[in-house]
């Protein structure tokens, strides 16, 4: 099993696609993950569906709605995660999740089982890092060697970024634009300078996400970001083709290969 940090040991930017677990069903997600990894994913983000995904745009909200149309359980989430890990044990898996599903399961139980299923990192958009609850959770993650990946937005101050330094691990998820997730037509101005500043302060790889969907965008961003994160464009392929597993897997493989080939 490779660590997240080892994935960033080469000079090439890392492709990090995202899928919503359970969309359109759990078995299909193993096939989607396999296609994306074969297409060049270096890390895979797995979204845990939630009823109130405040940071997510319409594509991922609809994916969660489709996922939650089936019986939901963290047991099934962990089982599917383990299946993906067994197929590609060399690829680090990261959960992108809201805090409530983890809290409902019990944080100690979750961290133990997540680690055993192959999870190496967590991204939790609605968990502030400077609360007593977060500090206790971070201690549990550290004991299990699970990275906590912090989000930095265009509005995050330099002082707040500095305060993340002692707690952040794995990489920094840099949110490239204001608002929720979703595909956008242009790259935000000043993105390169901002990413370089965050990397200098925190001393971790910085990966860019939110709004990236095309190979032209990934080609440019990969020249200065350590990784490129793409979620909504991947989920749109699943939304439009998920009823035909073979066709959808082929389209995901082709898309991942195109993005990977564009990156520096």
Curated annotation (Swiss-Prot):
<comment type="similarity">
    <text>Belongs to the TrpA family.</text>
</comment>
<dbReference type="Pfam" id="PF00290">
    <property type="entry name" value="Trp_syntA"/>
</dbReference>
<comment type="subunit">
    <text>Tetramer of two alpha and two beta chains.</text>
</comment>
<dbReference type="InterPro" id="IPR002028">
    <property type="entry name" value="Trp_synthase_suA"/>
</dbReference>
<dbReference type="GO" id="GO:0000162">
    <property type="term" value="P:L-tryptophan biosynthetic process"/>
</dbReference>
<comment type="function">
    <text>The alpha subunit is responsible for the aldol cleavage of indoleglycerol phosphate to indole and glyceraldehyde 3-phosphate.</text>
</comment>
<keyword id="KW-0057">Aromatic amino acid biosynthesis</keyword>
<dbReference type="InterPro" id="IPR018204">
    <property type="entry name" value="Trp_synthase_alpha_AS"/>
</dbReference>
<keyword id="KW-0456">Lyase</keyword>
<feature type="active site" description="Proton acceptor">
    <location>
        <position position="45"/>
    </location>
</feature>
<comment type="pathway">
    <text>Amino-acid biosynthesis; L-tryptophan biosynthesis; L-tryptophan from chorismate: step 5/5.</text>
</comment>
<dbReference type="InterPro" id="IPR011060">
    <property type="entry name" value="RibuloseP-bd_barrel"/>
</dbReference>
<dbReference type="GO" id="GO:0005829">
    <property type="term" value="C:cytosol"/>
</dbReference>
<keyword id="KW-0822">Tryptophan biosynthesis</keyword>
<protein>
    <recommendedName>
        <fullName>Tryptophan synthase alpha chain</fullName>
        <ecNumber>4.2.1.20</ecNumber>
    </recommendedName>
</protein>
<feature type="active site" description="Proton acceptor">
    <location>
        <position position="56"/>
    </location>
</feature>
<dbReference type="InterPro" id="IPR013785">
    <property type="entry name" value="Aldolase_TIM"/>
</dbReference>
<dbReference type="GO" id="GO:0004834">
    <property type="term" value="F:tryptophan synthase activity"/>
</dbReference>
<keyword id="KW-0028">Amino-acid biosynthesis</keyword>
